[in-house]
């Protein structure tokens, strides 16, 4: 049974008024909130009642979700278009039960690879790994893009208070040389270790940045190729290309086909995280995610946070035609969390074809966007409060901070809670009109201005409150959203683990690059007039 069938449309006819729902049920928050360890999930400000939630849960029970959860964790090839298992969960699994994929126990492989990463991190941190000139490494530059950049960068920033190794970690992703130059301007070639993170070792942006970084290094070492081995490690499955680059294969770390890029921070791709926060803290990150994996796998749907998250998001998409989801973390340390989750969500569920290959006739993935509070309040919250677009909101708040500025933390949390309350209750015309009269305006002035100050309210939001932002709790938070994305894909009958939509642009980009360098080429002759004219404008600059 598909989640987005016509039977969902009638749920909107319940005409939920949040203020009324809270007024008539003093146990609403208790009914519509959940807890996993130190994460509190309050979904009471959503447009639901007991009847709607029951209907959504029944749809989940009738779907293939239970079977799909088992299949994913057991290594079935649920990525059907690429014939691959989806096992990022195995990277953080603390159990010892064998998990066989294509005839191999991948638990042993994962354990072995973790140990290799741990040894590298400890070797660099301790100073036993030295640069070519004999100096200790002081800076790590991670060169990767997409999942090889967004996840590690987000975690390294989020866990800045846990940095404990004296290593400075930098990230380079964009093919725009400015991305690389920003890093090279602040590092010393004699004390820098580069991580090249590319499964294929042919990703255009990563390869071009890596080649330029290599040239920069060799320029300092008078073209002595032996220097490369002291200053580069790789995370790739293409050993021949890694060796050709000059990297010792002993320092090439694995990427498996059963780990998608946007779910890879738990793998060797998370090496840059371990360099910043130490390997012990990296393991705590994995442990937090594992706690959610167990909880997700073992908890009934009605008490399962990722399932409820997915049901609400799918309900709004199918019933209210929501095309957007706002994510508002009220913590500066989570400043890259929206960017990270954009890829995880939109690359996973931005699909218009079902698993069988048929075109879907319902809305699937939405635009996920947002920003850090309180900055967003002075930028885009106006649209959330008074715009005419339906946008569900997720607030993420941290109860305690790492600093001693308690007045700042209280103000931050007060603003977060106030925004969710304002979205829910709004302010009516009568409320505004009476306030304006009290402020000294006459009736004519008050009537003229009141309509502009009305805030409709009744706009749904969820608040996720963490006790603290630690490696463990961050791992758990990420895993909650990962599983939410998975559940939505199952409900919509789409494959959340391929990304064919990004391939065409890559292919055309290579053709256009050839055309830019040779206007007699077939690639140039096959261009449309608009693209040809754009190339001409660039050449005539």
Swiss-Prot record:
This is Glucose-6-phosphate isomerase. Catalyzes the reversible isomerization of glucose-6-phosphate to fructose-6-phosphate. Keywords: Cytoplasm, Gluconeogenesis, Glycolysis, Isomerase. It is found in: Cytoplasm. Pathway: Carbohydrate biosynthesis; gluconeogenesis; Carbohydrate degradation; glycolysis; D-glyceraldehyde 3-phosphate and glycerone phosphate from D-glucose: step 2/4. Its main location: cytoplasm. It is an enzyme of class 5 (isomerase). It catalyses: alpha-D-glucose 6-phosphate = beta-D-fructose 6-phosphate. Its EC number is 5.3.1.9. One of its GO terms (cellular component) is cytosol. InterPro entries: G6P_Isomerase, G6P_Isomerase_C, Phosphoglucose_isomerase_CS, SIS_dom_sf, SIS_PGI_1, SIS_PGI_2. GO terms for molecular function: carbohydrate derivative binding; glucose-6-phosphate isomerase activity; monosaccharide binding. The gene is pgi. The keyword Cytoplasm applies. Gene3D superfamilies: 1.10.1390.10, Glucose-6-phosphate isomerase like protein, domain 1 (3.40.50.10490). Belongs to the GPI family. The active site is at 347 (proton donor), 378, 506. PROSITE patterns: P_GLUCOSE_ISOMERASE_1, P_GLUCOSE_ISOMERASE_2, P_GLUCOSE_ISOMERASE_3. One of its GO terms (biological process) is glycolytic process. It comes from Francisella tularensis subsp. holarctica (strain OSU18).
């Amino acid at each position: 049974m598909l989640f987005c069938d016509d039977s969902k449309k009638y749920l909107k006819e319940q005409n939920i008024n949040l203020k009324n729902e809270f007024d008539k049920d003093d146990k609403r928050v208790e009914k519509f909130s959940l807890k996993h360890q130190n994460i509190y999930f309050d979904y009471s400000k959503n447009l639901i009642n007991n009847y709607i939630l029951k209907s959504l849960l029944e749809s989940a029970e009738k779907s293939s979700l239970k079977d799909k959860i088992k299949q994913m964790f057991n290594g079935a090839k649920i990525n059907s278009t690429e014939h691959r298992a989806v096992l990022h969960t195995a990277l953080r699994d603390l159990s010892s039960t064998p998990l066989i994929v294509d005839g191999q126990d991948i638990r042993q492989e994962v354990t072995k690879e973790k140990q290799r990463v741990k040894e590298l991190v400890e070797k660099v941190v301790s100073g036993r790994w030295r640069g070519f000139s004999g100096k200790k490494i002081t800076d790590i530059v991670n060169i990767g893009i997409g999942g090889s950049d967004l996840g590690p960068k987000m975690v390294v920033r989020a866990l800045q208070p846990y940095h404990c190794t004296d290593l400075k970690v930098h990230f380079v992703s964009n093919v725009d040389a400015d991305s690389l130059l920003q890093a090279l301007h602040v590092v010393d070639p004699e004390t820098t270790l580069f991580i090249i993170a590319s499964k294929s070792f042919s990703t255009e942006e990563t390869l071009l940045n890596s080649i330029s970084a290599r040239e920069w290094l060799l320029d300092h070492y008078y073209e002595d190729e032996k220097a490369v081995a002291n200053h580069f490690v790789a995370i790739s499955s293409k050993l021949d290309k890694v060796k050709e680059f000059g990297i010792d294969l002993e320092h090439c770390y694995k990427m498996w086909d059963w780990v998608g890029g946007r779910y890879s921070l738990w793998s060797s791709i998370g090496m840059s995280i371990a360099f910043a926060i130490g390997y012990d803290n990296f393991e705590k990150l994995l442990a937090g995610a594992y706690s959610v994996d167990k909880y997700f796998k073992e908890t009934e749907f009605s008490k399962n946070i990722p399932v409820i998250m997915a049901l609400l998001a799918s309900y709004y998409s199918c019933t209210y035609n929501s095309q957007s989801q706002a994510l508002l973390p009220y913590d500066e340390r989570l400043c890259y969390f929206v960017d990270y989750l954009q890829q995880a969500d939109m690359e996973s569920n931005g699909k218009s074809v079902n698993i069988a290959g048929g075109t879907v006739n319902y809305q699937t993935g939405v635009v996920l966007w947002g920003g850090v509070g309180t900055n967003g309040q002075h930028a885009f919250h106006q649209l959330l409060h008074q715009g005419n677009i339906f946008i569900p909101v997720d607030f993420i708040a941290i109860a305690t901070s790492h600093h001693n500025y308690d007045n700042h933390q209280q103000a931050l949390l007060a603003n977060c809670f106030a925004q969710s309350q304002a979205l829910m209750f709004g302010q009516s015309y009568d409320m505004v009109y009476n306030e304006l009269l009290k402020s000294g305006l006459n009736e004519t002035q008050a009537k003229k201005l009141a309509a502009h100050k009305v805030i409709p309210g009744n706009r749904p939001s969820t608040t996720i409150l963490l006790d603290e932002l630690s490696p463990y709790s961050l791992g758990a938070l990420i895993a909650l959203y990962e599983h939410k994305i998975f559940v939505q894909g199952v409900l919509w009958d789409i494959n959340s683990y391929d990304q064919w939509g990004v391939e065409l642009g890559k292919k055309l980009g290579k053709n256009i690059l050839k055309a830019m360098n040779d206007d007699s080429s077939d690639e140039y002759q096959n261009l449309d007039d608009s693209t040809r004219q754009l190339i001409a404008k660039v050449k005539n600059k």
